[in-house]
Structures are given as C-alpha cells and as structure tokens.
Amino acid sequence: MRIYRIDREEEAIAEVQRYLRAASYRYEEIPHVGIDGIYGEETKDAVTAFQKHFRLVETGVVDETTFSKLYLESLA
C-alpha cells in the first residue's frame, strides 16, 4: 500500500499532483497544484481540500482510500 505524506519526493507524487490538478478544474474548492514531484505544503493543502470535498478523513495524507478516489476522479 502506498502512503504519501509531506516531504516525500518521487515520481508517484507527480502522479498524485496530476490527479489533484484535474480535480481542481472540476471543483473550485480544491486548489491548483504545481506538478513537481514534491509533497510539500501546497500538495498537502490540496489533498486536505480534496478529502474534505469528498467527505474523507481530512489528514492531508494520501492513503489508499484517498488515492483510490483521486484515481477514480481522474477517469471522470
């Protein structure tokens, strides 16, 4: 199981950021994020907003549930 949290840097983080960016165009309460592969405050804030919008536990951490929802939203 992948878990993404602040201060992680890798290609998989860029994937999460791409999903978040796509969601931010559909839902105005989710802020736009840069796609740099770094899980910083900007990404954490967007993850938290995404979790809040979809009534997930608001941790700012991309756990399995959050990742699954991000992925499904990217297919919409």
For each feature predicted by the language model, list its residue ranges.
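Acidic, Ser/Thr/Pro/Gly-enriched interdomain connector segments
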Residues: M1-G37, E42
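Active-site catalytic microenvironments for nucleophilic, acid-base chemistry
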Residues: Y19-A23, H53, E73
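Calcium-binding motifs, dominated by EF-hand helix-loop-helix domains
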Residues: I35, F50, F54
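Short, electropositive, low-hydrophobicity segments enriched in small/polar residues
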Residues: E41-K44, E64
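Conserved hydrophobic/aromatic packing and binding residues within compact polymer-binding modules
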Residues: V47
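Extracellular LysM carbohydrate-binding repeats and other cell-envelope/extracellular binding modules
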Residues: R55-A76
